UniProtKB/Swiss-Prot annotation:
EC number: 2.1.1.-
Gene that encodes the chain: prmA
Enzyme class: transferase
Record's catalysed reaction(s): L-lysyl-[protein] + 3 S-adenosyl-L-methionine = N(6),N(6),N(6)-trimethyl-L-lysyl-[protein] + 3 S-adenosyl-L-homocysteine + 3 H(+)
Keywords for the protein's UniProt record, in alphabetical order: Cytoplasm, Methyltransferase, S-adenosyl-L-methionine, Transferase
Keyword Protein transport applies: no
Any GO BP: methylation
Pfam families assigned: PrmA
Binding site for S-adenosyl-L-methionine: 145, 166, 188, 230
Family the entry assigns: Belongs to the methyltransferase superfamily. PrmA family.
Function: Methylates ribosomal protein L11.
Protein name as annotated: Ribosomal protein L11 methyltransferase
GO terms of molecular function: protein-lysine N-methyltransferase activity
InterPro entries in alphabetical order: Ribosomal_L11_MeTrfase_PrmA, Ribosomal_PrmA_MeTrfase, SAM-dependent_MTases_sf
Length: 293
């Protein structure tokens, strides 16, 4: 079934009032977009981010008459007679199928491949992680995940235990096991992530070496030779003492999920417990690594 959408240019403070009016007019959904395409990755603590130039996108059924809707919107004081808007036809698509069609096997480092479960494996002799990410974050396509996978590919896992702190889909945990880790512990605040990690471990035949916990259930004495945390700068900052105490002396650390401009601050924060390396970058994102003192 096709749709039509009404796109309205406005400023941030008026977006909610216009959105309410559109819902009363029969809109099926409302989406806010940044009119200047400036992404907000992680707001400052206590800050509510607002775009100064907001595009409101209202979706309607294809046969909906938008002419009277536009006329009534002109009566809103925050819009007026000459407000900027556009009506567009929207093709009906199977978005899940389209996403699957565009997710291909990806190589990381010298030996590691991430392969979606519905694709053929390009190199059967490589280390292949078969992934079905479900609803949890982590497919390898995001720069932070890629940075972590490239780091994991270059490690020696002989008799090593690993912690995946914020395991999401389990992509990093499963990759470490397929690369030779003795045992991996995955921790996440989201039960759905725990289930996705479990399913992906079973798909790769490594479920017997993977322990998964919500934070409140993890063992108090949990320690690892290698810890990777692909979360965000805020949690990395707040949880630094907890993360540090889980790494054995001489153990390895990798942190990602942070922007380039956040890397220096987070690196300095962790230098209390780790000898930190120079950051690695991909696009706007960074990865920090270090060795436990």
């Amino acid at each position: 079934m096709p749709w039509i959408q009404l796109r309205i240019d406005t400023d941030g403070p008026n977006a909610d009032a216009i959105s309410d009016q559109l819902m009363e007019e029969g809109s099926l959904s409302i989406t806010f977009e940044d009119g200047k395409d400036n992404p907000i990755y992680e707001p400052t603590l206590g800050e509510t981010p607002l775009w100064s130039h907001t595009v409101i996108v209202a979706l309607f059924e294809a046969n909906f008459d938008l002419t009277p809707v536009v006329e009534r919107l002109k009566l809103l004081p925050c819009l007026g007679d000459n407000f900027s808007h556009k009506v567009e036809q929207v093709e009906d698509k199977d978005w899940e199928r389209e996403w699957m069609d565009n997710f291909h096997p990806i190589k990381f480092g010298d030996r590691l491949w991430i392969c979606p479960s519905w694709r053929e494996i390009p190199d059967p002799t490589a280390v292949n992680v078969i992934l079905d990410p479900g609803l949890a974050f982590g497919t390898g396509t995001h720069p932070t995940t890629a940075l972590c996978l490239e780091w994991l590919d270059g490690l020696d896992y002989s008799n090593k235990d690993v912690i995946d702190f914020g395991c999401g889909s389990g992509i990093l945990a499963v990759a470490a096991l397929k690369l030779g880790a003795e045992r991996v512990t995955g921790i996440d605040i989201d039960y759905q992530a725990i289930e996705a990690s479990k399913a992906n471990a079973e798909r790769n035949g490594v479920e017997d070496k993977l322990a998964l916990y919500l934070p409140e259930d993890q063992p108090a004495d949990l320690l690892a030779d290698i810890l990777v945390a692909n979360i965000l700068a805020g949690p990395l900052r707040e949880l630094a003492p907890l993360i540090a105490e889980k790494v054995k002396p001489g153990g390895l650390l990798a942190l990602s999920g942070l922007l380039q401009e956040q890397a220096e601050e987070i690196s300095a924060f962790y230098s209390e417990w780790f000898n930190m390396d120079e950051p690695a970058h991909k696009d706007d994102w960074s990865r920090l690594t270090g060795i436990r003192k």
